[in-house]
């Protein structure tokens, strides 16, 4: 294949295009990273005009992406060098790669600041503050600001506090100030933004409110809704065409349509005081009474058209009461009254910024926001007229770089955009900008990403070759099967538009199939298949539905009832998902297994649990239920929730211990420690403690109990108090991390939790706690009290962390993750669950809303009457935020669906299927190819988008049948996508498990079956039996289970065992971590364990061993010190050895394979009497390091990391002979295949010992 033919035409244009500004819109799975790398490679290896790689600035979104990019470029350069080994230029590029600017925007900013620190008067020895430290400094600064306001008795401050400070304290106002400070950091010049937006509320009298930013947003919103109402009335008129007995209705509905048209005409006209004219028109909008009809009418159609008219009335009422509520002068008067309050709020933020900056300066630290703003300060200058121009430093960077390449451009914010502009825009000599991304995957607005930056260029750049500003669309998807591609296109062509989604999903944006799958699959397997849509009804079928309206006028269930309903809904969905996963793992009715295409082996294989991912909009409240339900069904599952760390028992116990070391006069933490294994009080002993002195503090009662000296509880109390006093003394001079180290050691708690269920996870959590304490001690805040205070603030601000990660990519489990975490990943089978969950619009209920373009949106508050209502500015911002939030939700759905490679399953739950489908039917009953933006923005969840779209699919009649196909009047679409729609009720789903009633019934039957116990009359027989002696006492001392290591020891009694030289291998991370040992560094045993762990988890298909080890560190699978102990060169030597090459050539490689087999007792205990061991067996357990299969049998490989003296090779062979023989025996029993060869590989010197 030539270099050109392996790329599509569009990809080749993106690789070779030399336009000044090039925007590449790369759809999901379009190979954008490969294109980016190839463009760089072509530039630096161009024979006529090569560009040194250190003259390219490559900006990525994350450090991991930067590392991956650097590795891929290095690999590509190496391949070019192999093709042309004599090229001095390619060798030069490989040398320059180390200093190339392939980096995140923050790292680039840091480089600019360090090189030009003198320009901004900053200490050149500054460091970047830990997030913990910066938050604490910010809180301290905020407290100082508020204290000053109280001391100065600032009236404006007290007025602001009265209006927005909350009922009991000033916490709500403090949070407001913090939120506003954080919000403005994504603006290039935060204080200028504050000034501008504050002054925008001081509107001159006589202004047409419709000409303000807020007014124009509200009028645009009203226009979209009026167009939606027009479609609804037109739908009703269409129904009335052939509705018998309803002819008189038609004139009334025509009048309604004319009134709506008149309002739309006013909105489209440019006129003086347009707002007031529309206000007056709305006030005069009257709905005529529907005339009476005869008895012979079509009742069903009458009900439908009446419901449509009621909805129209409700919307017009909303315009009057909540949107266009008064004339311009009245609105302006309200906003002017809010102006001093917003000015005071802005001043508080400025004071916070000033004090926070002072604290950072004193400690010579900066935070991540400072990196961008300081960099911008260095790169810009202000002219006398206030305009911004590039500084000399910026111009020097323009001269340095030949091109700037920005990855994930859709996630940029305005500060980052300005930085790029300063070093790229200008004359023809300035570097060009290559931007690549996909606005349909912009899902980080909560991090202040600005997708409109991408959209602005997308809508203005031309596709023409040679245009100075050009766009190229990469729409071919190389990831997914055609079934997935067609389904995604079918949905998004209908639901995504500029009104809802901020982009029209046209044929240009649609995905094109480009993946390569072997379509000649074997007949005994099933592959791909239709996209599945499972809809669950969670309410009982026979329930009398008294309410369905979830709006403001609907019945409000109490909080407990809602929580219970939500949990029930999640359980139902989890059970259905679990059932579907089990079905995928089993053969179908024809005995065929569902299979996926393995790219590495270039063949199909049976689907495994690791191939399946469950994507949730949020894991909170959902993931735990899914884990529980799937686990009960026997499905191995792991959820990366990102929360729950502080709720784990082991972390709570250790934090409680730290709390009472700091202050023992705290009953609840003390009780937690006493009940834990650290002290081990039983419930009876706790009761005894409380009775010592019922009114005293628990700590005082504990001292009295210890002083009594009576009983076991007193002994425990005395020992614990002695230890507590010792730890309290240590805390005065010992850092928190070292104190934790000491506590783990003294209490043995680390080892204790390791023996508990999920012990490895618990130990990992304790290591994370230690690491968190170590990081805290590196900040300027030190000491136990400050650490406890920080943790309390972290918990109270919902700053929980996820539990430690102990999962590797090779673990065969179903993964549960949020859609956000799945971005950039792909999975063979994707289940998008929870589609019935309501969108989270809670942020729109805050007292003051904020928007980058619209500024402040406060409530109007009359604190004397204790009344508040949203200002028109807030209403405008609310509409804007809602539209932006729902557009982002639509993009999040797009990200979720495009993660699937081979199989896509969508699930969601509703209370009542019929009523849900009726609602969707209203949205779907349009004759246009795209559903209305009005209906999409009215959706409450993903189902409200997916449902109406599927109702219009020609082959989804089953969904339409829920309400009767005759009621559907929309456009039926004959689309190539293939769907399977299944509707479930609660009973269907619950049948997959045992119901609670069933369980209770079985329990009662068991109780009834019990006979009343009668006293025994056979005393003599009882005594005889109790005095019986077991004849095989000696055999009873033989263990039922023994390890291969023990066998080796017994067979090598002649040779002494040197533990340091020949360590036993233990599972990784079971022993105490290095920081608990009384020595520095890692033992030989630990190093051997770590090497075995790495060999188990390495992807042999990748050559970047070092990078994989770094990834293990990033995932908390290894510590940095453990990673340093692994010699990648020795691993590579093994893989390049004849044995290693044979292994890599095998299609079946198995690593760290545990086994349990039975062996006769006398094989091990030869000195036991024959009668004692006769017929007895032992369970032999062990773990085979590695074996691989060849056509004529199995090859067994065991790794050893021992140091071997030159003359001791045969000793090694003899020492491990028995172990290897038993490994081979176990493998033959497990696989039924012959082990033809057995080897030990010595990592120390690369020798291979055969047996």
Swiss-Prot record:
Query: Which prosthetic group or cofactor does it need?
Result: Mg(2+)
GO BP annotation list = double-strand break repair via homologous recombination
Do you know which PROSITE patterns this protein is assigned to?
A: UVRD_HELICASE_ATP_BIND (PS51198), UVRD_HELICASE_CTER (PS51217)
Q: Does the keyword Isomerase apply?
A: yes
Please give the Pfam families that the UniProt record associates with this protein: PDDEXK_1, UvrD-helicase, UvrD_C
Outline the extent of the UvrD-like helicase C-terminal domain: 526-824
Q: Which residues form the UvrD-like helicase ATP-binding domain?
A: 5-481
State the superkingdom.
Answer: Bacteria
Region Disordered: start and end of each range? 544-565
Q: What GO molecular functions are on record for this protein?
A: 3'-5' DNA helicase activity; 3'-5' exonuclease activity; ATP binding; ATP hydrolysis activity; double-stranded DNA binding
- Reaction catalysed by this enzyme: Couples ATP hydrolysis with the unwinding of duplex DNA by translocating in the 3'-5' direction; ATP + H2O = ADP + phosphate + H(+)
Q: Which GO terms describe its cellular component?
A: cytosol; DNA helicase complex
Show the InterPro entries listed in the entry: AddA, DNA_helicase_UvrD-like_C, DNA_helicase_UvrD/REP, P-loop_NTPase, PDDEXK-like_dom_sf, PDDEXK_AddAB-type, Restrct_endonuc-II-like, UvrD-like_ATP-bd
This entry's Enzyme Commission designation comes to 3.1.-.-, 5.6.2.4
Keyword list (alphabetical) reads: ATP-binding, DNA damage, DNA repair, DNA-binding, Exonuclease, Helicase, Hydrolase, Isomerase, Nuclease, Nucleotide-binding
Q: List residues binding ATP.
A: 26-33
According to the record's subunit comment, the protein's assembly and interactions are: Heterodimer of AddA and AddB/RexB.
- Function noted in UniProt: The heterodimer acts as both an ATP-dependent DNA helicase and an ATP-dependent, dual-direction single-stranded exonuclease. Recognizes the chi site generating a DNA molecule suitable for the initiation of homologous recombination. The AddA nuclease domain is required for chi fragment generation; this subunit has the helicase and 3' -> 5' nuclease activities.
Say which family it is in: Belongs to the helicase family. AddA subfamily.
- The name on file for this protein is ATP-dependent helicase/nuclease subunit A
Q: What is the lineage of its organism?
A: Bacteria, Bacillati, Bacillota, Clostridia, Eubacteriales
């Amino acid at each position: 294949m030539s270099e050109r033919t392996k790329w599509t035409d569009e990809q080749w244009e993106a690789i070779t295009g030399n336009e000044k500004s090039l925007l590449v819109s790369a759809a999901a799975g379009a190979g954008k990273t490969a294109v980016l790398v190839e463009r760089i490679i072509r530039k630096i290896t161009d024979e006529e005009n090569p560009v040194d790689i250190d003259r390219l600035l490559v900006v990525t979104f994350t450090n991991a992406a930067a590392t991956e990019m650097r590795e891929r470029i290095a690999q590509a350069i190496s391949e070019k060098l192999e093709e042309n080994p004599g090229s001095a230029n390619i060798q030069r590029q490989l040398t320059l790669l180390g200093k190339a600017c392939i980096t995140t925007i923050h790292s680039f900013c840091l480089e600019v600041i360090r090189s030009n620190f003198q320009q901004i008067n900053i200490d050149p020895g500054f460091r970047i503050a830990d997030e913990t430290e910066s938050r604490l400094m910010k809180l301290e600064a905020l407290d100082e600001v508020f204290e000053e306001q109280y001391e100065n008795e600032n009236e404006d401050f007290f007025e602001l506090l009265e209006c927005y400070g909350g009922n009991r304290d000033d916490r709500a106002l403090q949070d407001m100030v913090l939120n506003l400070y954080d919000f403005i950091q994504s603006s290039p010049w935060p204080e200028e933004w504050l000034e501008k937006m504050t002054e925008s509320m001081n509107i001159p009298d006589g202004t047409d409110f419709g000409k303000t930013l807020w007014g124009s947003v509200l009028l645009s919103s009203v226009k979209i809704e009026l167009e939606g109402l027009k479609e609804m009335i037109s739908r009703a008129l269409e129904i009335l065409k052939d509705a018998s007995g309803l002819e008189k209705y038609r004139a009334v509905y025509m009048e309604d349509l004319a009134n709506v048209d008149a309002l739309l005409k006013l909105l489209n006209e440019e006129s003086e005081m347009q707002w007031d004219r529309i206000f007056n028109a709305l006030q005069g909008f009257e709905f005529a009474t529907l005339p009476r009809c005869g008895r012979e009418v079509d009742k069903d159609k009458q009900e439908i058209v009446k419901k449509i008219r009621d909805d129209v009335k409700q919307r017009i009422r909303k315009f009057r009461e909540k949107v266009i509520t008064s004339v311009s002068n009245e609105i302006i008067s309200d906003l002017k009254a809010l102006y001093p309050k917003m000015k005071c709020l802005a001043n508080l933020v400025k004071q916070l910024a000033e004090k926070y900056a002072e604290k950072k300066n004193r400690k010579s630290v900066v935070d991540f926001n400072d990196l961008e703003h300081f960099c911008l300060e260095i790169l810009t200058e202000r002219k006398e007229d206030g305009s911004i121009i590039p500084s000399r430093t910026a111009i020097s960077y323009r001269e340095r770089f030949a091109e700037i390449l920005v990855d994930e451009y859709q996630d940029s914010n305005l500060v980052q955009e300005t930085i790029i502009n300063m070093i790229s825009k200008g004359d023809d000599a300035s570097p060009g900008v290559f931007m690549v991304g996909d606005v349909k995957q912009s899902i980080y607005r909560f991090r202040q990403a600005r997708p409109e930056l991408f959209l602005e260029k997308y809508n203005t750049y031309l596709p023409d070759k040679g245009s100075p500003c050009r766009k190229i669309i990469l729409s071919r998807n190389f990831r997914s099967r055609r079934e997935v591609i067609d389904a995604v296109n079918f949905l998004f062509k209908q639901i995504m538009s500029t009104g809802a989604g901020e982009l029209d999903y046209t044929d240009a944006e649609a995905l094109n199939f480009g993946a390569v799958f072997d379509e000649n699959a074997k007949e005994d397997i099933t592959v791909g298949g239709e996209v599945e849509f499972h809809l669950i009804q969670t309410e009982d079928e026979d329930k009398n539905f008294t309410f369905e309206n979830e709006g403001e006028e609907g019945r409000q269930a109490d909080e407990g009832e809602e929580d219970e309903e939500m949990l029930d809904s999640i359980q139902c969905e989890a059970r259905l998902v679990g059932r579907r996963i089990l079905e995928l793992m089993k053969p179908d009715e024809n005995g065929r297994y569902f299979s996926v295409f393995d790219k590495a082996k270039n063949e199909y294989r049976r689907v495994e649990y690791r191939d399946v991912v469950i994507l949730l909009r949020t894991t909170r409240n959902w993931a735990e239920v899914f884990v529980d339900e799937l686990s009960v069904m026997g499905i191995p599952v792991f959820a990366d929730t990102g929360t729950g760390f502080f709720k784990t028992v082991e972390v709570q116990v250790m934090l409680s211990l730290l709390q009472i070391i700091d202050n023992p006069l705290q009953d609840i933490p003390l009780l937690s420690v006493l009940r834990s294994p650290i002290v081990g009080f039983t419930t009876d002993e706790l009761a005894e403690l409380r009775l010592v002195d019922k009114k005293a503090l628990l700590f005082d009662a504990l001292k009295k109990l210890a002083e009594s000296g009576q009983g076991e509880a007193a002994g425990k109390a005395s020992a614990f108090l002695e230890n507590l006093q010792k730890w309290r003394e240590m805390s005065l001079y010992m850092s928190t991390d070292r104190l934790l180290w000491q506590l783990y050691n003294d209490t043995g708690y680390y080892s204790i939790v390791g023996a508990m269920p999920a012990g490895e996870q618990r130990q990992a959590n304790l290591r994370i706690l230690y690491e968190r304490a170590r990081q805290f001690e590196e900040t300027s805040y030190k000491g136990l009290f400050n650490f406890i205070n920080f943790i309390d603030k972290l918990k109270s601000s919902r700053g929980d962390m996820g539990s430690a990660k102990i999962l590797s990519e090779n673990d065969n489990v179903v993964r549960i993750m949020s859609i956000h975490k799945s971005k950039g990943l792909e999975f063979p089978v994707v289940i998008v669950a929870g589609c019935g969950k309501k969108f989270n619009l809670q942020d729109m209920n805050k007292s003051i809303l904020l928007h980058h373009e619209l500024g402040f949106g406060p409530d109007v508050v009359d604190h004397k009457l204790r009344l508040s209502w949203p200002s028109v500015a807030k209403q405008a911002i609310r509409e804007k935020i809602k539209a932006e939030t729902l557009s982002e939700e639509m993009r999040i759905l797009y990200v979720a669906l495009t993660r699937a490679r081979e199989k896509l399953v969508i699930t969601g739950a509703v209370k009542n299927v019929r009523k849900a489908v009726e609602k969707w039917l209203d949205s779907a009953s349009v004759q246009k190819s795209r559903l209305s933006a009005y209906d999409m923005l009215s959706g409450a969840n993903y189902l409200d988008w997916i449902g109406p779209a599927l109702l219009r699919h020609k082959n989804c009649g089953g969904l339409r049948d829920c309400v009767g196909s005759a009621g559907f009047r929309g456009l039926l679409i004959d689309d190539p996508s293939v769907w399977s729609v299944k509707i479930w009720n609660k009973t269907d789903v619950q049948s997959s498990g045992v119901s609670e009633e069933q369980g209770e019934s079985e329990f009662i039957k068991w109780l009834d079956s019990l006979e009343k116990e009668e006293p025994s009359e056979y005393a003599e027989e009882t005594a005889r039996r109790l005095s019986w002696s077991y004849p095989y006492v000696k055999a009873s001392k033989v263990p039922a289970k023994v390890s291969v290591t023990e066998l080796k020891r017994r067979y090598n009694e002649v040779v002494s065992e040197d533990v340091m030289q020949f360590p036993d291998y233990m599972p990784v991370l079971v022993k105490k971590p290095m920081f608990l040992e009384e020595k520095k560094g890692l033992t030989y045993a630990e190093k051997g364990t770590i090497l075995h762990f790495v060999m188990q988890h390495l992807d042999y298909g990748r050559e970047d061993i070092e990078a994989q080890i770094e990834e293990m560190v990033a995932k908390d699978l290894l510590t940095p010190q453990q990673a340093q102990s692994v010699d990648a060169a020795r691993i590579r030597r093994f893989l390049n050895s004849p044995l290693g090459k044979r292994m890599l050539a095998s299609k079946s490689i198995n690593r760290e394979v545990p086994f349990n087999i039975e062996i006769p007792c006398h094989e091990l205990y030869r000195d036991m009497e024959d009668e004692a061991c006769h017929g007895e067996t032992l369970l032999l357990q062990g773990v085979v390091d590695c074996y691989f299969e060849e056509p004529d049998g199995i090859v067994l490989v065991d790794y050893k990391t021992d140091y071997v003296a030159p003359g001791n090779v045969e000793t090694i062979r003899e020492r491990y002979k028995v172990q290897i023989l038993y490994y081979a025996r176990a493998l033959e029993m497990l696989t039924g295949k012959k082990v033809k060869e057995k080897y030990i590989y010595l990592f120390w010197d690369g020798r291979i010992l055969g047996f």
